[in-house]
Structure formats: C-alpha cells, structure tokens
C-alpha cells in the first residue's frame, strides 16, 4: 500500500510510534546504538488564520526529539516522501572522522531525491546537553527540524542540580508564504528575503498573534521544582532575546558544552545556538499572586534602516499547579530587552564561561599554528554580474544591484557535486579551489558607520586545507551592518575574544580569555565588531563553515575546511559508505 493511500490519522499515528518506539541495540565498538526512522512528508498546518502545506518529519512540526547518551551511535533512516531534494544536518555533533553523515547539501553529500532513502550514522563523542537537527537544503529547515538531547553516560550525572523535568524549547519563525518560493524570489530579483510573519515557540506564535491563543504552548510547573529548559534558536533570520516573567534563568550549557552557572534575567541566543537553562519554580502562590507567566522570545536586530518587520513577541505560558481555574492573564517579562538593544546582547555574551571542572576540563590551545583573519561582508553586485541578460533584478541601490555576501572577498558557490566526494577521490579540479585566503584583500572599511562593500567580492568554491592537528585561530571581523552567527561543522571551538570595532592584532590578543572561554560551535559576531576562536584540527574530513542567517549562506558567506588524515588509523577519515546519494 502506498503511503499516499494511508488515512492521515493512521499515518500520523504510525509516525508517532516510529518516533517514540526507538530501538536500542547492544553496544557496538563500545557505543550503544539508537535507531530512528524519519519520513519526510508534506503536511498541512494552520497558523495566523492561514493554512499551508509544509515539509515535516513524521508529520510533526517541530519534528521528533532524538534522545541519546554521551558516546552513543544514533542511526537515522531518512525516507524522502516529499516533493523535493533534501538533506539533514546534526547541528553541533562533531561526527569524529565521519563527514559522510554531516549533511550539508553539495558539501558532504548530494541530496536525497524524492522517493529516495539515506541512512545517517550520527556519532556522539564529547557532547552533553542540547543540540538539534535540521534540513540543510534550501530554506527547508524552517519546518524540518527538531531537538537532540544528549544525556551523560550511565553512572555519570549533570554537573548541576538534577532537574525535575526537561523541556525542549524551540524558537523559530513562521511565514504565511511558502519559504522556498520566497527563496527563489530572493535569488531571482536579488533582494532580501521577506521578514517572517511571526516568531514561534515550539511551533506556536502565542497569544499576541491572530488565531493563535488557543494553541499557545504551555508549560505546567509545580512550586519548588526545578526545570531544565533546552532552548534552541532555529530561526532562519533572527537573533532572539528570551526571558520568563517573574523568574531568573541560570545558564548551565551552550551548544552541548557545560558552562559556569550564570544567573540572568534574559538571554540572547543566535540562530544555530542552543542553551541549557535552569528555571526554579519559586514564585509565591498566595491569594494575590499570579500563577501564570509569559515565556517570551523577541527578535534582536541590528539593521540600521527601517524594515517592514512585525516586532510582536512570541509567547508561551508557564502555569503553576494551583487548582484555580480562574487564574488571570499571564505577566509579561518587563526585563526583556528592546528590539535593537546591542548593549544588552553584548553584556550577556561577555559573561559566558566554560565550566572548567575536574570532570569537564578546559583545554585552550596556547600555541597557534595558523592565523586567519576573515572579513564578513554584505556586498552589492551589479545586476548583470552573473548573467549578462539579467532583467529581473530589483535589488537595492535603485534596482541596479543584487545582494551578495562574502568571506575574505569570496562569495562561495556550491559545486554541482559534493566537495567531500571530489576530495575523497582526488578529483577536486573543477569542483573546488584550495586557496581560500588567510586574510582579506586590502580594502578600506569604515566601521564607525553602517558599512557595505559594493562589488568587492568574486564567486568561487574556495576551501582551506589544514594538516591534521593544526591549531587554528580565526578572527571573524564583521564589516557589515548586522551581526553574524558563524557556525563550524565538525568542531567545537573556544571563543577566546569578543570586541567592538576593528580587530587590532597588537592590542586585542592581550584581552583574550585563555583560562575558561566558552566552548561553542556557533559564535555571534557582533555588528562592526570581532570574535576570535581557537580549535585544533583533529577531525579529518570536509567541514562546512557558514553564517547561520540562511539568506547570508545563500548569498555566499561560507567556506569549507578540509582537514587531512593523520598518521594513525584513528586519525583518518572513515571509508565512504556504499549508499551515498548520487548527484
């Protein structure tokens, strides 16, 4: 019987069974195996008084949560019953020696075609905490996404008070239009993508949006209990501030790496990032006290010009068990920063520190082998830069240009076959060039104003090749009018420095934190500022690095690190699986 003939209710029930009845195999090579089946399908969802068909996994939006323990092997069978090509990325999972299952389209694999199947082997290593998975093709991750929760190994414990309950909180965005139609229009006319119609918390916009109040996500809490909020910013275009009215939040992890406990009124979380937050349900339940509190997510935006942006805030409701059916409206978090509060964002980011305990030590490299300064730029190219007959261009600067983006003056263009395939078989010629520059071309950049760099870019698939074990320091220098969440596949890195203005290589390294810097896989590079990261290139393979604002990735703010094999078998990339999708 074809899947299309199964009644919708039975289909969703079957998917739910497959999602939650996860097979756990005996340990293999010291790893416990966990098995999941993901079915990509078109599913109708109604939001903001409007129904549309979206791609989902197992009919769910957000998709199913993957549960694992540190060091497990998670095997995910992906069946593409949708109407377009797709890939899945396991965001923040290092995947030691296994780029074959990392997921970015045309970087480590060709996409899974409609009616096709691919089995991902997701190798957990040092991660503990919250990560996530998402589509890594076009704008599909708007709805094809879900949480990954990695618990400590059996016998180990959290390095903080054990929570009474864990609650995944996925922050996202919703468009009334088809997101991939918006993507195609953006590419066709060279303009920015239309802003989303709503922010969401676990797929719901909340009480402040039309036709949404009945479905607002609710969290039931009991006085005296502790809750672990596993917060993920899955948005395509927006940094977000997040807070819970009447409650402080204690940050205990970021990107599945533990932090020193940091108690705050709010957080700022960039797209791609995850944070583990402890919430103490400690509010008084007296006769005059409210028992309902808003959990709120508001966009943080640094763009200098007015845009048609709906800055209403997504909300969920934290409700105390009181037995009072007549509880009043929830309180709103007055501490939530305003839409453009750069100081609030920087104040939060500067406080993050790695835990640095005996069981979770810090190993910041003190000697650097390879220094890289990478300019992050938004560019404007002539409308006919890539097509001499371009007549549809309606981009900025009086409809004479189209948007582009670059790293060190190079706008990355994905090849027709994946980079990993070409590298593995020694056939990179004509697929990629291995001369990504360590420094930007000398161009004057005014960081005191709202800068852009018209025309200072070229298209290409340039990659950076690293010897195994090389210690790399990358300084990201923002030269544009907004911040950039930079994500590196295959590695976590230490964020050793963060600052405003132009990086000074004589002065700023003296300000680095080499004692307990946060250990992340996505860093928010401040507008007209810089961020310095360090990592050891000890994971052989092909690894994508890109801005996690998806429109910037489409415009070319990407590159690839190729890490060569080391000398021992355990320092060499795993063999190519036999079932890789074909281009």
UniProtKB/Swiss-Prot annotation:
Cu cation 2 binds at residues 91, 134, 548. Coiled coil: none annotated. Cu cation 3 binds at residues 136, 489, 546. One of its GO terms (biological process) is lignin catabolic process. Glycans are attached at residues 85, 282, 311, 384, 387, 399, 409, 446. One of its GO terms (cellular component) is apoplast. Keywords: Apoplast, Copper, Glycoprotein, Lignin degradation, Metal-binding, Oxidoreductase, Repeat, Secreted, Signal. Residues 39-155, 165-323, 436-567 form the Plastocyanin-like domain. This is Laccase-21.
């Amino acid at each position: 019987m074809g899947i299309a003939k199964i009644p919708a209710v039975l289909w969703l029930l079957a998917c739910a069974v497959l999602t939650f009845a996860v097979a756990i195999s005996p340990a293999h090579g010291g790893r416990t195996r966990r098995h999941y089946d993901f079915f990509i399908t078109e599913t109708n969802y109604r939001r903001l008084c409007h129904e549309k068909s979206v791609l989902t996994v197992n009919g769910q939006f957000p998709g199913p949560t993957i549960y694992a323990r540190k060091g497990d092997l998670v095997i995910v069978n992906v069946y593409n019953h949708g109407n377009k090509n797709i890939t899945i990325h396991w965001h923040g999972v290092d995947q030691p020696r296994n780029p074959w299952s990392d997921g970015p389209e045309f970087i480590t694999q060709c996409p899974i075609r409609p009616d096709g199947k691919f089995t991902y082997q997701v190798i957990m290593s040092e991660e503990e905490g919250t990560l996530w998975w998402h589509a890594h093709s076009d704008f599909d991750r708007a709805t094809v996404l879900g949480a990954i929760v990695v618990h400590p190994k059996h016998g180990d414990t959290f390095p903080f008070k054990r929570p009474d309950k864990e609650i995944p909180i996925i922050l996202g965005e919703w468009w009334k239009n088809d997101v991939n139609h918006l993507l195609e229009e953006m590419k066709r006319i060279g303009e920015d993508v239309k802003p989303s119609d709503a922010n969401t918390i676990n797929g719901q916009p909340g009480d402040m949006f039309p036709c949404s109040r009945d479905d607002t996500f609710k969290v039931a809490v009991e006085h005296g209990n502790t809750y672990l909020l596993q917060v993920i910013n899955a948005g395509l275009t927006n940094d977000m501030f997040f807070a819970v009215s009447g409650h402080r939040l204690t940050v205990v992890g970021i990107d599945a790496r533990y932090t020193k406990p940091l108690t705050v009124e709010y957080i700022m979380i960039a797209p791609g990032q995850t944070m583990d937050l402890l919430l103490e349900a400690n509010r008084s339940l007296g006769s005059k006290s409210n028992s309902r509190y808003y959990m709120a997510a508001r966009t943080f935006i640094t763009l200098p010009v007015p845009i048609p942006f709906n800055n209403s805030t997504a909300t969920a409701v934290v409700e105390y068990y009181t037995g009072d059916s007549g509880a009043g409206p929830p309180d709103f978090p007055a501490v939530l920063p305003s839409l453009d509060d750069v100081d609030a964002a920087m104040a939060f980011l500067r406080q993050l520190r790695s835990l640095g305990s005996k069981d979770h030590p810090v190993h910041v490299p003190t000697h650097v082998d390879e220094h890289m300064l990478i300019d992050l730029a938004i560019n404007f190219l002539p409308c006919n830069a890539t097509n001499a007959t371009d007549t549809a261009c309606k981009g900025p600067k009086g409809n004479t240009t189209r948007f582009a983006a670059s790293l060190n003056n190079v706008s990355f263009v994905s090849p027709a076959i994946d980079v990993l395939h070409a590298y593995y078989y020694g056939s990179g010629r004509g697929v990629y060039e291995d001369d990504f520059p360590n420094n930007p071309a000398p161009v004057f950049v005014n960081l005191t104003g709202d800068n852009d760099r018209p025309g200072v870019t070229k298209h290409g698939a340039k990659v950076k090749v690293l010897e195994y074990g090389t210690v790399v320091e990358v300084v990201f220098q923002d030269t544009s009018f907004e911040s950039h969440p930079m994500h590196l596949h295959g590695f976590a890195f230490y964020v050793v420095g963060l600052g405003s203005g132009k990086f000074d290589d004589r002065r700023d390294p003296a300000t680095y934190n080499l004692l307990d810097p946060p250990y992340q896989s996505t860093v928010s590079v401040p507008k007209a500022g810089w961020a310095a990261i360090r990592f050891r290139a000890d994971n052989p393979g092909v690894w994508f690095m890109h801005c996690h604002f998806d429109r910037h990735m489409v415009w070319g703010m990407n590159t690839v690190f190729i890490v060569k094999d080391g000398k021992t078998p355990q320092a060499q990339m795993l063999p190519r699986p036999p079932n890789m999708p074909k281009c």
